[in-house]
Amino acid sequence: MWGTEDWTVSAVPGSESEVANGPWEGMKLPELVSKYPVEILGRKVAEAYGNQLPLLTKIIDAQKDLSIQVHPNDEMAQREHGKSGKSEMWYILQADQGAHLYAGFKQAISPYEYQNRVEDGSITEVLADHQVQAGDVFYLPAGRVHAICGGIRLAEVQQSSDVTYRIFDYNRPAWMESPASSIPS
C-alpha cells in the first residue's frame, strides 16, 4: 500500500465533509457554508467566492513514493474540466530520516526532453529534490511538477479541486494524462 490520504475538510462534490455533532449534525459542509457564508468564510472570502468553500484540506501519509504529478491553473482547469485549478501548500508533520520530496525542476528543460524523460523513466533526474523535516513548508503553485516521497506525513491545504495529472508513476501500472500543457514554459 502506498499510504493514506484523508480529506479532512472538503466541499468537493462527492467527497463533502459532514458535520459530526451539534445542531447541524449530518449536514454537508457545502450546505452549511451556503447558509452561513460570512460567519464561516469571513466577509472578504465570502465576497470573493460566494457560497463556495475555496479550500480543501488533507492529511497525506506516504509510505511509498507517490506519483509525480502536476495540476492545471484556474484557466486551464476551467477550460478542460469546468473546475478550479489547484495550487497547494504542504506542511510537513513527520518525516523519516532522509525523507525527501520533489518540487519543480533543477533547470529549464524543453518539451522534447520532458517527454523523453517521462517515457524513459529518467524524469526524477531533472526534478528539484528537497530533503525534509517536520515543520518544513512548501508552496506549490499550479503548474509546478511535484511528488511526495515515502516516509513523509503532511498536511495539505489546496484549492478546492480534484484535478490532477499524473506524469510518472515509477513504471507501476498507471496512466499518463495531459500534464505537459499545465507546466509553464
Describe every region a protein language model picked out.
Residues M1-I109, D169-S185:
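Transition-metal
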Residues I68-H71, V132-G150, Q159:
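Conserved metal-binding segment of the jelly-roll/cupin
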